[in-house]
Amino acid sequence: MTLIVTRDHAQWVHDMCRARAGNRYGYGGAFTLNPRDTTDCSGLVLQTAAWYGGRKDWIGNRYGSTESFRLDHKIVYDLGFRRLPPGGVAALGFTPVMLVGLQHGGGGRYSHTACTLMTMDIPGGPVKVSQRGVDWESRGEVNGVGVFLYDGARAWNDPLFHDFWYLDAKLEDGPTQSVDAAEILARATGLAYNRAVALLPAVRDGLIQADCTNPNRIAMWLAQIGHESDDFKATAEYASGDAYDTRTDLGNTPEVDGDGRLYKGRSWIMITGKDNYRDFSRWAHGRGLVPTPDYFVVHPLELSELRWAGIGAAWYWTVERPDINALSDRRDLETVTRRINGGLTNLDDRRRRYNLALAVGDQLLTLIGDDDELADPTIQRFIREIHGALFNTVVTQSPYGDPQNPDGSEPRSNLWQLHELIKNGDGMGHARYVEESARAGDLRELERVVRAAKGLGRDRSPEFIARARNVLAQIEAANPEYLQAYIARNGAL
């Protein structure tokens, strides 16, 4: 269970570190209440974990060594350490208070460790979560100093290290502070602030629909889509589209009839061709985003509008290349580039964009939500699914349904929303129940048929009156005693 560290206690840990920074390196030593007593690399890491955990036995107790991590000693887990999962910090769902990197070389001078405190004490307080963190290390002495805090200390992810752990503890929640999502977008993409303000809704929609729910996915999406769309400028390809006019492999007609221009590349990922417009329409309809499953086939120019730019990219991201999010979780920039581009064209620009976005860290999550819990991507997905279940149309299964239109689409009379199906089922099912019950001698339901035959029922159309009279005629022919019983109880028909 993840330990919750109070801000006051985190401040105490920082004070303990600051008091010992500048000490000499002490191989085999341990920190004590005397701030001049010192320790080595593993003692520093293990005792700092004990400080965060509030253990009372830390004084003079170094707990173990770098080998304790390599050999999975129990004390490492007792202190609260866990090995980082393949997805890294992003896969945890929270920022731990401490991250650790290790070099394993059999102990002694060939092994080393350092850590980064992911809490930061700032002037005037309070302690807060930090995406960069404060590096904290005991190492070989430089000018008589072996214990470094901030400057001079290696970070947990220094290239020297190849084994990574975290302390399963996080800082307590603090007061919610407003974050300007447009500013975050500008920092993550290099866009001017005013452009970021204008693009934010389309970016947010695209990220949510693409299920980009962690910083790694968001950074990859911003980098790749930013490159593919000419820095988010192009919502339609710059060429006319005439080159696609007879591309039957894209679903366009073989004639030179303008299909190329109608269905040229649009959205930030350039959805191209009538077939792809149809596939995207069905996907968008299934999510409750458009009213019909052929919406963009009928209204292709709308796909050039900014509001669809990110959503179009999300369709490609999740449907056409469904492994991209998993690759993004692994930060596999090259493979994602191949999925989108077919090669590694302009990889340097994609990498530049990617690193720029990654540097923003967890604040990227601001782009997919706000203070409203309904902005949470999971909640929004549930809402879309519920909306789709209620209001998306399904085609009638009745063999008496109307024929399809000449273009293969369904007439509106064959399409039903859930509430329409319920009402339709009630309309057909109840009528059938009443008539069958009347034929079986149920005088209560026979009363309904008699009333309808007199033109006094809910449906007073000539067609339905004739239907009710036909039911009475069938009963009279097959079971006249039912009508006689009804007349005996109620009088003449």
Swiss-Prot record:
Q: Which InterPro entries match?
A: Cell_Wall_Dynamics_Protein, Lysozyme-like_dom_sf
Q: What class of enzyme is it?
A: hydrolase
Return one Gene Ontology term, BP aspect.
viral release from host cell by cytolysis
Q: Which SUPFAM superfamilies match?
A: Lysozyme-like
Name the Enzyme Commission number(s) assigned to this protein. 3.-.-.-
Instruction: Keywords in alphabetical order, please.
Output: Antimicrobial, Bacteriolytic enzyme, Cytolysis, Host cell lysis by virus, Hydrolase, Viral release from host cell
Q: Which GO terms describe its molecular function?
A: hydrolase activity
In terms of superkingdom, the source organism counts as Viruses
Q: What does this protein do?
A: Endolysin that degrades host peptidoglycans and participates with the holin protein in the sequential events which lead to the programmed host cell lysis releasing the mature viral particles. Once the holin has permeabilized the host cell membrane, the endolysin can reach the periplasm and break down the peptidoglycan layer.
Q: Which family, according to UniProt?
A: Belongs to the L5likevirus endolysin A protein family.
Q: What is the designated name of this protein?
A: Endolysin A
What organism is the protein native to? Mycobacterium phage D29 (Mycobacteriophage D29)
